[in-house]
């Protein structure tokens, strides 16, 4: 099949920038349409059209996807308490299915022959893009130049320089960076020596402990149906809420992650993440669930949360299993209404209070050890006998 028109998922980084001349010169593509998703990157998006066009793209489309990114991806992750391997809140992984869906839509609208991405052959994003595209449009051809060209990062930078491509990395600062509203991910370069502390320069949206305020700050986050809706009594739209959560947590140095991560392709890698607001909201949400959900629901949901995070990390956002887990998780959130107080100080976010006027399962009359206690203590003996009966019978059988 001859490929004349391609829609490229474009970030403005060294790999996707180099993909444009590579697709034209090596694949024989006549027209490369660059598509960039606005996911709250801020200033990084300003020069992106010019970069794509100067690299050889026929046009560059920039779509504002911030609203669906928060409401359809970030908020479900908060409701799922999604932490891959117990640490990473999927800030980058959550963006990939949204980008893939819009990429497919644009390809169909423009009647393109194929889509393309600049993911390397050892990363996670190639899996996420390829599977999402195959699920949404199995008939669509996917070109993967960065998986085929066999160049090292230094060689890719040099290749881009030959075509006048201004890359956001250099040989002196060879980090690979992904940025969106939910956070930053940084890898490569000096970070590959896992015995060394990350240079402070890799952090941009969280303060070092030395530069955080000496005075702690207590904030209150209000949830409705499992979604955060207000901070300190002020109801906010989703974008403003995420921005404020990032500012508050980042100012106090909360939200840095330095982890050895198990990639989908089977290798371990060192990843640096800054996700101050998302981590803060997940922590507060977990606490509110502990107040409003029954114990058996919490235990079951905890197991499914791990699976949900794994599926999203592994590129299976559109899978039947992930959609089924959404159904369970969403049903549990009907009762997750209330507020959580969090103290931010020197890199920590400490829960200091929680309340739910509608759905609290903490009943003071039953929990108190004071005179208002309504718990019937004499019922405990019978309960313990029945509860421990299997153990008692097992012990008797051993003593025959």
From Swiss-Prot:
Gene Ontology process terms (BP): argininosuccinate metabolic process; L-arginine biosynthetic process; urea cycle
GO MF annotations in UniProt: argininosuccinate synthase activity; ATP binding
Superkingdom, taxonomy of origin: Bacteria
Pfam family, one: Arginosuc_synth
Binding-site residues, L-citrulline: 88, 124, 128, 176, 185, 261, 273
Entries under NCBIfam families matching the protein: argG, PRK00509.1
Family statement drawn from the similarity comment of this UniProt entry: Belongs to the argininosuccinate synthase family. Type 1 subfamily.
Protein's name according to its UniProt entry: Argininosuccinate synthase
Originating organism: Prochlorococcus marinus (strain MIT 9211)
């Amino acid at each position: 099949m001859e490929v004349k028109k391609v829609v490229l998922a474009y970030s403005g980084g060294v790999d996707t920038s180099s993909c444009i001349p590579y697709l034209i010169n090596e694949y024989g593509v006549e027209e490369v349409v660059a598509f960039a998703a606005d996911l709250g990157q801020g200033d990084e998006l300003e020069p992106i059209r010019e970069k794509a066009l100067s690299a050889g793209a026929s046009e560059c489309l920039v779509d504002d996807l911030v609203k669906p990114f928060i409401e359809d991806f970030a908020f479900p992750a908060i409701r799922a308490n999604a932490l891959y391997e117990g640490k990473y809140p999927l800030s980058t992984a959550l963006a990939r299915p949204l980008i893939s869906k819009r990429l497919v839509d644009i390809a169909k609208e423009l009647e393109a022959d194929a889509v393309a991405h600049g993911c390397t052959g050892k990363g996670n994003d190639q899996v996420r893009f390829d599977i999402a595209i195959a699920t949404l449009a199995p008939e669509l051809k996917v070109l993967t130049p960065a998986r085929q060209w066999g160049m090292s990062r230094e060689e890719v930078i040099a290749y881009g320089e030959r075509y006048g491509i201004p890359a956001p990395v250099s040989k002196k600062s060879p980090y690979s960076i992904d940025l969106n509203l939910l956070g930053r991910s940084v890898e490569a370069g000096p970070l590959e020596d896992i015995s060394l502390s990350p240079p402070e320069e890799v952090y941009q949206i969280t303060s070092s402990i030395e530069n955080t305020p000496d005075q702690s700050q207590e904030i209150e986050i209000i949830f409705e149906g499992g979604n955060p809706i207000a901070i300190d009594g002020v109801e906010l739209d989703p974008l403003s809420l995420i921005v404020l959560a990032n500012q508050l947590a980042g100012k106090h140095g909360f939200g840095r992650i330095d982890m050895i991560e198990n990639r989908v392709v089977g290798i371990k890698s060192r990843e640096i993440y800054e996700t101050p607001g998302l981590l803060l909201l997940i922590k507060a949400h977990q606490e509110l669930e502990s107040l409003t959900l029954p114990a058996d629901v919490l235990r079951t949901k905890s197991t499914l949360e791990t699976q949900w995070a794994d599926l999203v990390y592994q590129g299976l956002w559109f899978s039947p299993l992930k959609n089924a887990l959404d159904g369970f998780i969403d049903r549990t959130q009907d009762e997750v209404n209330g507020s959580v107080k969090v103290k931010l100080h020197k890199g920590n976010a400490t829960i200091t209070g929680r309340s739910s006027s509608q759905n609290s399962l903490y009943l003071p009359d039953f929990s108190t050890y004071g005179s208002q206690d309504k718990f019937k203590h004499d019922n405990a003996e019978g309960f313990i006998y029945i509860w421990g009966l299997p153990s008692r019978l097992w012990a008797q059988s051993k003593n025959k």
